Amino acid sequence: MARPQLLSIPERLDANPRFTGRGVVIALVDSGFYPHPDLMRPKRRIKAYADATRDEAVADDFFTPRAASWHGTMTACTAAGNGYVSGGRYRGLASEAEVVLVKAMSSEGKITGKNVAHAIRLPLRYPHLGIRVLNVSLAAPSSDPDLPEVEAAVAEVVAAGITVFAAAGNTPGRPSRPPASAPEAITVGGLDDKGEREGDASLWPSSYGTIREGLDKPDLVAPAIWVPAPMLPGTLVAREAVALFQLLSVLEELSVEQGFSEQKQRASHDERSSVNGLIDAVSARINRQKYIGVDYQHVDGTSFAAPIAASVAAQMLEANPSLTPAQIREGLLATAAPMPQYPKIQQGAGFIRPRQAVMWAQQKKQDKFVAAVEEGALE
C-alpha cells in the first residue's frame, strides 16, 4: 500500500517561498496548546503562553499533552509550524513567525464569552509582545450572555493595529457567531481544494449568512479539509498511528512470497488471503483516522482555514510591515479569487491567494515610497 501523502499548504496555494512570516508575531486563541517540536525546534518560536481562564498559567497544562491541547496545537502549527518532525514537509505559510498561545477553554472544558473576550484582549495588556495578527478558532455557545463583549474585544484589538481572523464555523446556512460575526474580524469560511494545487475546488460546508443589515460573513475562504497537522506526542491517537504503520509494514512483508520463503515456507492461498485481509483492515483504519504518517493527520473545519488566512497576513506584514488591519483586509479581499458557481454570501471575496496578496503588499510599499519621493520627504 502506498503511504498517504499530502501536499503542504504552501505548495497547494502556490505561495512565494521567500515569505515565511519572519519578524511577525501571531497570537492564537484556542482551547489549549502543547509546545510541539514544529514550533520549538530547531529554534523556539513560542514567544509566550497565557491562560485566559486563570489568573496565572499552569506550566503543567502546557508542557503535558492533554486531551484539550490537540486543537490549539494543530491550529498553531497550521499557521506557523515549520514541519520539523516531517523534515520540513508539512510546514505552514508563516513557518518563521513567532507565536503567542492563549488558552481560552477552562479545565472543565467550558468556553465562555467572558474568557474568549479576555483572551482576545491579551495584546492590549501586553503590548511589548508585538503581536500583529490574532487568530481565533473557537466560539462560546450562542446562548452565552457575554457574546457582545467578544465583538467589542475584536473592535478594540483591531483599533490598536492588530488584524483579527476568526473561523466562520461549520454549520452551513447558519450565520457565524462571535468573534466571527464582528465587523472588524476577517471571517474565514472553508474551501475544499481536494488537497491539490490545481484541484477541482468546491466550498467546504461552513457557516455563512447575514449577521445584520449590510454585514455578510464570511469575508473569504481558505482550505478547510486535507490540512496536514501534527498529532500530540504520546497520546493514544499518536501511539495508534505508530502501531498501525508498523503493523502495516510487517503485513506487507508477509504478503510477498519472499517473506515466507525466508523461513523455507510457501504461503498457502488461505494464508495469503488472511494477510491481505489484515492489510485491508489496517489500511482502512489508517484512512478512517486520517493518518498521513506516524506524526501527522489531515484535519478539517474552518478552525484550520482561519489560521491559514492569518499566516498569509503574516507574509504580507513581512513584505510590508507598515500595513494596517484595514489594508490587510483590503489586500486579501482584492486578491482573492471568486468562485462563480457559488453565491457571494457563501464565499465572500472568494478563495485566498497568498502569492497575489504578498505582491499587493509589496506594491503598497512601493507606492508609499514613490509618494514620499514625489512629496520631497525622501531625497
Regions found by a protein language model. Name each.
Residues 14-50, 61-113, 129-132, 181-184, ...:
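Subtilisin-like serine protease catalytic core
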Residues 104-184, 212-215, 290-306:
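Substrate-binding/access-modulating region of protease and related hydrolase catalytic domains
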Residues 29-32, 79-82, 102-106, 136-140, ...:
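Active-site-proximal beta-strand/loop segments in catalytic clefts of secreted hydrolases
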Residues 80-84, 121-128, 155, 159, ...:
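Sec-exported extracytoplasmic/periplasmic mature domains
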Residues 63-76, 297-311:
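Gly/Ser-rich catalytic serine loop of serine hydrolases
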Residues 35, 85, 170-175, 194-196:
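Active-site environment of divalent metal-dependent phosphoester hydrolases
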Residues 30, 47-54, 182-310:
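Extracellular S/T/G-rich loop segment that most often corresponds to the catalytic His/Ser-adjacent loop
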Residues 131-135, 271-272, 276, 280-304, ...:
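C-terminal subdomain of the subtilisin-like protease fold in secreted/lumenal serine endopeptidases
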